[in-house]
């Protein structure tokens, strides 16, 4: 499916429209084009966000190469962990604050996805009549939104729960310090069942471990 969100930052009520488009993959492109036309959004800037299953994110040591060669060097560095060939992979990196890993040296987060998936998303957006600006990942989007919604000089935490998984982001001063997949499966059906109490306790333990790491190991307490 596709989550279609229309936002007007200049408006008193920025969120204009939100809906989920659920259909077969072969019909989604047509559905999106129809909704763009119905909402008179043709030509509006669009910021596409990849679904979590469309990419992998991993923490890596920054290679000692010129800035322009970092992405390609990291791509080769993580080749054995990729679910696709090097030729089929698209890898982008973003910095982790130096204060987060003083002992290890400079670290980066590397996001890897199939080139073909990038092309699919690009064509989907353009064929619907939208003006594609970027194709991003959820971590970057959450970071940007969180910075607009709350003061983060002391640190911000965001728990993203979907598809039975939970990912925690710890941010400070507009930068991601920690992105961690929590070792706890969460399903909406569990929240109303007897098993929720034990699942909730495991979730609390995982969260506390992450907060302790942020405060003690990263020195951000």
Describe the predicted segments one by one:
Residues 1-221:
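Hydrophobic/aromatic-enriched cytosolic interaction surfaces used to assemble or bind macromolecules
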């Amino acid at each position: 499916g596709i989550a279609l969100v229309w936002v007007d930052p200049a408006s008193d009520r920025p969120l204009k429209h939100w809906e989920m488009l659920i259909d077969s993959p072969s019909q989604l492109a047509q559905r999106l084009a129809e909704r763009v036309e119905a909402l008179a959004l043709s030509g509006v800037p669009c910021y596409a966000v990849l679904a979590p299953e469309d990419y992998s994110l991993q923490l890596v040591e920054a290679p000692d190469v010129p800035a322009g060669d970092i992405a390609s060097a990291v791509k080769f560095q993580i080749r054995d962990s990729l679910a696709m060939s090097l030729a089929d992979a698209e890898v982008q990196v973003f910095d982790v604050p130096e204060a987060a890993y003083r002992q290890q040296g400079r670290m980066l987060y590397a996001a890897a996805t199939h080139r073909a998936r990038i092309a699919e998303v690009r064509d989907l957006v353009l064929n619907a009549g939208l003006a594609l600006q970027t194709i991003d990942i959820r971590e970057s989007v959450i970071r940007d939104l969180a910075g607009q919604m709350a003061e983060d000089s002391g640190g911000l935490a965001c728990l993203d729960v979907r598809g039975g998984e939970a990912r925690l982001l710890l941010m400070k001063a507009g930068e991601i310090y920690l992105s961690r997949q929590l070792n706890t499966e969460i399903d909406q059906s569990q929240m109303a069942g007897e098993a929720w109490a034990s699942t909730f306790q495991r979730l609390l333990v995982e969260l506390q471990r992450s907060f302790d790491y942020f405060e003690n190991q990263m020195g951000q307490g």
